[in-house]
Amino acid sequence: MRTGKSDISGWLVRPAGGHLWAVLVTVLAASAAHAARLTPDGGMDNAIVVRAARTWLDGGSPYDDPHFLYLPSAVLAAVPQALLPGAVLRVLVPCAVTVLLALAWACALLLHRVPLGSRLAALGLTGLALGFAPFGHLVRLGNWTVTATVALPLALLLASRGRWTGAGAVIGAAVALKPLLAPVVLLFLFAGRWRALAAAVLVPALASAAAALAMPDPAGFFTRTLPFLLHGDDGFVRLYEASPAAVLPRLGVPAALAQGLAVAAACAGVLCAYRRWRRADPGPLRLAETGAGLMLSAFLVSRPSYDHYLLVALPLLLAGLPYAGSVARGVWFWIALVPQAPGLTWPWLEGERRRAFRDAFTLCVLAVTVARQGWTAPAGAGERVPQGRAPEPERAPAAPF
């Protein structure tokens, strides 16, 4: 990759001026302050988890609330918040979510060997905060999806440095808080990293089993939450889901057919992610695109599937912008993001309950765009990995910029 003035990658990785950082800090501070003013309890979604923890402290079952969709270990993790007054949570939660989103972006940059002081570091996060509506939604909701947005790039960063068991432990810890990153265990399976796979499975299993023993309803997750997730019976929640299985029936497609199409698309996405992994090309794109592909495939079929779930995969893809052949260099990546521009009004899709159609467009186009990476090898891509345990990703001596 050239670093001359005519090449955008060279410009992006040069140091950012102080004015860019000032703009970024102002934007993030304004986003957090706006959320603190609007949400008296630290965000609607965070309040569900905190309420579950308070119910448990009072001797009740957290799973009495059908909207509590977390493992028992999340109840104990929310206890510190349950002990804080609402006035503190009102400020603390949006600030914490904003910091975690910035940390997720930093991990994605480090994975791609992009300097943290670069123009891409400043402009990328500013663009996400200003130009990607789910960023603001996540800050206002305080949803624990933010733990997954940090854990995935952090785990892939560890894996890129050969610390696979640590990567598995990070994924396991994130699943213990919210089981959103469960599909990433397939990456460890693809790579033949059995210790990492064991860590990713055992950490949430042991944490949840220990926490369940302290619950009045130890099997509540399996008897109440899991059936709710499998059947998606909440009509109100369904209006905000972005998966094809939820959106297509609203367009008149039979529910069974919609579910079948979503499952088929998810399976195809996993196959493409596997093919992407089998390409032994050096550099970080292999890890980033495989991980993002697995998560986007899961979002096609998962219930629920909300717009802010996209933030789990998007930073990984955007941080690869300096690399030729990356997803972010393709036009369809940017087309997918157009419906998420704040303030852009779409005819017949103005209402909040209809934004799921825009979210579904973004999800599906991103999923297809990433999946294509598994079938269209760029020029200079390495040979396929032989059968058996996958080797360490080949380390380039330096970033190509």
Indicate where each model-derived feature is located:
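Primarily membrane-embedded glycan-assembly and transfer machineries that use lipid-linked glycans
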Residues: 1-165, 194-314, 318, 322, ...
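Residue-level detector of transmembrane insertion/anchoring sites
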Residues: 135, 168, 293, 330, ...
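Residue-level detector of alpha-helical transmembrane segments in integral membrane proteins
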Residues: 127, 172, 308, 332-335, ...
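Transmembrane helical bundles and short interhelical boundary loops of multi-pass, membrane-embedded
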Residues: 327-401
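Membrane-interfacial entry segments at the cytosolic side of transmembrane helices
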Residues: 191-202, 327-333
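Membrane-interface alpha helices of multi-pass inner-membrane proteins
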Residues: 165-179, 183-188, 293-300
